[in-house]
């Protein structure tokens, strides 16, 4: 069949051919055509319903069954139907007539069913009449009530249930999280802790600082969440320590900002939880040796609960060792001072059981190198000698841990001393031509510098007054080790030359002046010598004249030195050097009295105008 798509008056430009014989259009040449035969579903004829009524809908009675249809005499309607069938004219096509007659015979055979006998039909009808009689229907229907009976029924009485519910008394000061709220500060902080990785730690810190924490109890709950995650996730413990390093001073709740608190609740709660975990001793060791002391019944009960005991043992051990990991990470980042680590070491050395020894070895392995570098070799020597004496009384596993710790100790080396004057080794000829080695005699201050460096590091992480009070013994140890005048001369030289620790060292001396053994005459000698060294110090440390002026100003404001000595210690450019600290004190309500002890208010007002 050809169809013309585009027609022109003269000739057709495009001609498309379409074969109607293909049922599904053209196919791939390599694939034979698939013939699909669609057969219509067989028509389901409805079954004839058995009715016990006449054609007009009236019910059949017993007398109706004894009619002429059951006799051999045919009715007129049946005779007429038979004659109509006989008088059907034959069609011309005999084949079609034959097929139709066969189909009619099949249908007639299928429709004809054997009729039951007359007695059976009468019996069936009697059974149906008995089954569906009015009495039977009334019995099956159940009890019947009249309208008056229904209206006279009283309402159902309510049964009171007295339930005794015991409610827990809420303790004061304990945070109860609201589970219905998903946008609370605690849930937001937990979400940020879960996001923490090595790559997005800066983003997590930024998001945590943006969270508004209302009360102190909420901040304590957040600190507890961070502590639990830090000790249970050893892979991320160093990242949690970095979080604490960045948030320990700045992150405060709204309630904290209204109070004058030196240490944040967030950092204080973390320290409390860490130290309490070590102080509250938890035993997790194997109870194999303890079973020898048990009776037979106790031993059988222990064997039944062995699996639960093993799980609990693992949780306790992992919690304690996780706390040591977190504590070591905080100390390595200088988040906490040596004072806290010394307290932990002393707590662990009080008892000699295997659990304590294991925790102590684990702690020294993590922080031992830093202790040696910071000049705490005597602590390592004390711990290692104590463990070496008692190692034979422990099991093989603990003994191996002690030997491993002793082997690692040999690889820990102290920090090298700072390079001194490069030209100290040069030889200088005197007037007589004899060579003199200027560096033959070492300055006593070179031995004090490592001690002062260690002290300044510990002061930088001592946030509480108790920590600084423990460090006050360093002044007495420095006096006895190096001498009073050499020690304090080096101490004040470091205070005015190192701007990073200048305020720490000067404030520390003023706070614990009473614990030192230096007299007023010795202090006067040290400060006058320090004033004479300013010309030499300012060559290498240009900031030393300004820091010297601030130092004597602080000493006079705290009444450590007298007014005559203060006037003697002043330099020619003191007024210009001390202007910054005087103005800072004068603008502060808390320190204004300090400024007025140095200058009168009129002089300070003149400085402000200038």
Curated annotation (Swiss-Prot):
Stretches the record annotates as Disordered: 59-118
InterPro entries for the chain: ARM-type_fold (IPR016024), MIF4G-like_typ-3 (IPR003890)
Gene3D superfamilies in UniProt: 1.25.40.180
Transmembrane segments: none
Organism ancestry: Eukaryota, Fungi, Fungi incertae sedis, Microsporidia, Unikaryonidae
GO cellular component: eukaryotic translation initiation factor 4F complex
Occurrences of domain MIF4G (ranges): 175-414
Name by which UniProt lists this protein: Probable eukaryotic translation initiation factor 4 gamma homolog
Function: Component of the protein complex eIF4F, which is involved in the recognition of the mRNA cap, ATP-dependent unwinding of 5'-terminal secondary structure and recruitment of mRNA to the ribosome.
Record field: compositional bias (Basic and acidic residues): 96-118
Keywords: Cytoplasm, Initiation factor, Protein biosynthesis, RNA-binding, Translation regulation
Localization per record: Cytoplasm
Record-level GO BP terms: regulation of translation
UniProt similarity note: Belongs to the eukaryotic initiation factor 4G family.
SUPFAM superfamilies: ARM repeat
Principal cellular location given in the protein's record: cytoplasm
PANTHER family listed in its UniProt record: EUKARYOTIC TRANSLATION INITIATION FACTOR 4 GAMMA, EUKARYOTIC TRANSLATION INITIATION FACTOR 4 GAMMA 2
Assembly mode: Component of the eIF4F complex, which composition varies with external and internal environmental conditions.
Gene Ontology terms for molecular function: mRNA binding; translation initiation factor activity
